Amino acid sequence: VYPGELHLIYSRDLQRNSILADAMLGLAPVTRGGIRFLGEDWAELSGDAACRLRRGVGRVQREGNWMETRSVMENLLLPLRHHTLIPEQQLRTSASDLAQRFGLPGLPLQLPGACATADLQRAACIRAFLGRPQLVVLEHPALSGDRDLIRPLMESIQQVRRRQGAVIWFTEHLSLMSDRGIPADRRYRIDSNQLHEWETDQ
């Protein structure tokens, strides 16, 4: 995946896609070959070096990965508070701007368990795009089929691409694969654990 590219991948196996996303980020071993990010082979990095490199990655995870004892807002802000030098006010402003883009009135103050599923999906997208990531991995960000999420999602994706970041998007929706309004550089499908080019007549 080159800087500025969007790769769209069709697969209905959500668990396998999460394992694949983990492997892309050096969080799961690969049996053959290697995976590099910004020229670095994950397998050759120390734990600290790998953690530093992952600071440049945003991700929407299938299971949400929420800390249940912290508000959704704290879940969004804590990683960047710990891993970047972005001033607190700038961080809050950026998060609030993304919240408005994704159709939320503000940053959710409830605990994750008290939030509606649709709001949590939007919050997961906010977290993934917050902080100018160099790579964004989206695991089924519109799992519920929420079409209202696609427009702000595409706006955020295009913003990442304009600053030469890359996006890998897993989807289980056939309609998205054939949607030419999504300017993907590559379209793929996963079949029998193999990655295949997407045929336009599918």
Regions found by a protein language model. Give the residues of each.
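Conserved ABC transporter NBD signature motif
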Residues: 33-43, 139
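Q-loop/switch helix immediately C-terminal to the Walker
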Residues: 63, 69-82, 94
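ABC ATPase nucleotide-binding domain signature
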Residues: 12-13, 56-66, 70
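Conserved catalytic loops of ABC-family nucleotide-binding domains
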Residues: 156-177
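Helix-to-loop junction immediately C-terminal to a conserved catalytic motif
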Residues: 25
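Conserved ABC nucleotide-binding domain
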Residues: 98-116
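ABC ATPase NBD coupling module
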Residues: 42-58
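ABC ATPase C-loop
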Residues: 128-129
